[in-house]
Amino acid sequence: ALAAVTDDVELGPCIALAPLYDSVRLAEDFATIDQISGGRATLGLAIGSNVSEFDAFGVPEDERVERLTDTVETLRGAWSDGPLDYDPDFHDISPDVTITPKPAHDVPIMLGGAARPAVRRAARTADAWCAPSSLSVGGVKKRVDDIRNVRDEEDIEGDFQVYVLQHGFVGDSREEAWEQMRDGYFF
């Protein structure tokens, strides 16, 4: 609905927990969003950290990094011209299959996370990184420097976007706004 009533709003989840999704279904669904929005989609992914979520989906938490990497590779293959040309480790699908629809443009993949390994993973495999609201300005600067260093040292070319997640809540007073959002913020 938002895609239909706007012309320049970038659309997509800030962070979806990649290990909990079927990567081929995610590729199809997100390509559809990109088509509907006229190429304004960005897909944010992360590994997740809440053990109860992994338990609920029956996904071993210790596979989360590998599952994220596998998802990114599957998405890139699914959105390329021709067949998938990638054999996913965690989903039973032939690399010869052609996934449709294709997105309207090259969908940027943004990875989230505050830990140094997460940031370095984003620098290597993604088009963007989302700094969580828990990082200070100094913490964001340190992570951005790390991204630059990784991309320079490993000769990675291309644009790389940095997003900074900030929360905003409205109320008649600061206290009322905090009261209304506190439980959801700490969930």
Predicted regions mapped to residue ranges:
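Active-site-adjacent structural elements that line small-molecule/cofactor binding pockets in enzymes
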Residues: 1-187
